[in-house]
């Protein structure tokens, strides 16, 4: 057995000026790229895939560089093209993810959750003819309701400047009744 890992490096370009920056560098076609759609091509000798997706409520493109040795070249190309737009480098922003209602696997949910618990019940079609694993269990949860539910809460306390690494227990009279999964 030989394991072959793809040489792919992701870079996100997001924010209100992301479409303008991407069009300046790659062409106006990026405006027509649908959400969760992608295009694979070669830009000035740099093999890339551009996808219209994102992990915040902001307009976002993900660039998948298919040759790590071209990373600096791609970064400089984007950076120079964005100077007139007053762009800046950033990192993951949990606030935007939470405000946008975007779930993160292991932060907000895991394999023990069902769609009713995490607000994804709109994706379930129990009336379809086709059978699928868990259909009867989901039908029962649909009738009885979920035992727990992911929800937001606002707590008046001192500000939290870092997101929590672990789920923190929620207690009532010393009994664990839930957990705080992602906080900002």
Sequence positions of predicted segments:
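Conserved, structured C-terminal
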Residues: 1-184
């Amino acid at each position: 057995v030989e394991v072959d890992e793809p040489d792919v490096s992701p870079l996100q370009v997001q924010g209100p000026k992301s479409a303008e920056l991407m069009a300046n560098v790659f062409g106006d076609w990026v405006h027509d790229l649908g959400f969760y759609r992608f295009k694979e091509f070669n830009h000035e000798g740099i093999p890339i895939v551009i996808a219209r997706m994102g992990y915040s409520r902001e307009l976002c493109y993900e660039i998948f560089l298919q040759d790590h040795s071209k990373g600096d070249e791609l970064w400089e190309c984007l950076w120079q093209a964005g100077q007139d737009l007053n762009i800046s480098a950033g990192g993951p922003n949990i606030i935007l993810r939470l405000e946008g209602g975007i779930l993160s696997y292991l932060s907000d949910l895991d394999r023990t959750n069902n769609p009713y618990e995490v607000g994804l019940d709109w994706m379930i079609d129990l009336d379809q003819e086709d059978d699928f694993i868990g259909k009867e269990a989901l039908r029962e949860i649909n009738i009885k309701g979920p035992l727990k539910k992911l929800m937001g809460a606002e707590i008046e306390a001192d500000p939290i400047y870092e997101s929590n690494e672990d789920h923190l227990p929620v207690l009532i009279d010393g009994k664990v009744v839930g957990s705080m999964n992602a906080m900002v």
